[in-house]
Amino acid sequence: MAPPQRCPLCRQTFFCGRGHVYSHKHQRQLKGALERLLPQVEAARRAVRAAQVERYVPEHDRCCWCPCCGCEVRKHLSHGNLTVLHGGLLEHLASPEHKKATNKFWWENKANAQMKEKFLISPQDYARFKKSMVKGLDSYEEKEDEVIKEMAAQIREVEQSRQEVVRSVLEPQAESDPEEGSSAPESWKATNGHVASSSQQVSHLALQPVAELDWMETGQQLTFIGHQDTPGIGNIHSGATPPWMIQEEEHSSGSLPIGPSYEEFLKEKEKQKLKKLPPDRVGANFDHSSNTSAGWLPSFGRVWNNGRRWQSRHQFKTEAATRSKQPRKGKS
């Protein structure tokens, strides 16, 4: 029996030796792993001749899984605020470690030999990518300079328009300042004269006698609306004691108990028990508080009142015999 081996693609242990790599399950898992990596490799190959440089965003930190090396690889190459798209994956595919791991992976898993070149980047292609990356960085810097110049021009235009608005507001005020200075004393005199005349009118009105009102002469009594103190009655606003702080005589004497008595509690408890029983039961209306004597049990039907059972049986037989003899004597 072959020793157990672990397959990383199928994620299981098999005991059939090298025959596992030829199974349909293993070949299906191998094909799926390579198809997941192939679109990303093709996108990286398209970036060899025209490298794209963009501003860094957190999405550029994504990684992809390389089944040949069995590790994660960063897709993009970032430095500071700049990111070269597909730079990390191209650098990994062009490394000698990846080439060695790919040859081993193809040999162990018996993959299609024609597809191996698709997952490798030659040194010539990687050198071409470096040259295009330099050109991409230069073009990106030129675009950034143009954007900065456009923003600076917009800032200058806004500042110039703001200064023109301020100048247009201040010029009319500067022209009207001399005229306002010459007319200031005249306006001051006019205002002073107006204030003096108004003060004289107020003093003249104050000296005139106030006419008495008609309702004062009629002698009608008026109701005072304001703070009224009722003797003996107060509230919390007038400083009186709150009602919950007053000790009443009934409660202070302690003659009245608080809550029901113990007897009432027992009666209520008994009523609650009787409510659970059916209302049409025998003896539902029986008064348990009535007094009964010891001979309350009926004597008919030979009820066993006292003594032994056989005594009552013999007594019943003798009484029945006497009752049967009495009608015979009557007939005779």
Curated annotation (Swiss-Prot):
PTM entry text: Acetylated. Acetylation oscillates throughout the cell cycle, and the acetylation state at Lys-31 is regulated by the deacetylase SIRT1 and the acetyltransferase NAT10. Deacetylated CENATAC is responsible for its centrosome targeting, and acetylated CENATAC promotes SASS6 degradation by enhancing the binding affinity of SASS6 for APC/C E3 ubiquitin-protein ligase complex/FZR1.
Post-translational modification N6-acetyllysine, affected residues: K31
Name of the gene encoding the protein in the UniProt record: Cenatac
Biological source species: Mus musculus (Mouse)
Assembly: Interacts with SASS6; the interaction increases with CENATAC acetylation.
Chain positions covered by the region annotation Required for centrosome location: 1-169
Cystines in this chain: none
One family name in Pfam for this protein: CCDC84
Keywords from the named record: Acetylation, Coiled coil, mRNA processing, mRNA splicing
Keyword Acetylation in record: yes
Acetylation among keywords: yes
Function per UniProt: Component of the minor spliceosome that promotes splicing of a specific, rare minor intron subtype. Negative regulator of centrosome duplication. Constrains centriole number by modulating the degradation of the centrosome-duplication-associated protein SASS6 in an acetylation-dependent manner. SIRT1 deacetylates CENATAC in G1 phase, allowing for SASS6 accumulation on the centrosome and subsequent procentriole assembly.
Top-level taxon of the source organism: Eukaryota
Residues forming coiled coils: 137-168
Identification of the protein by name: Centrosomal AT-AC splicing factor
InterPro entries: CCDC84-like
Region (Disordered) location: 170-201, 311-332
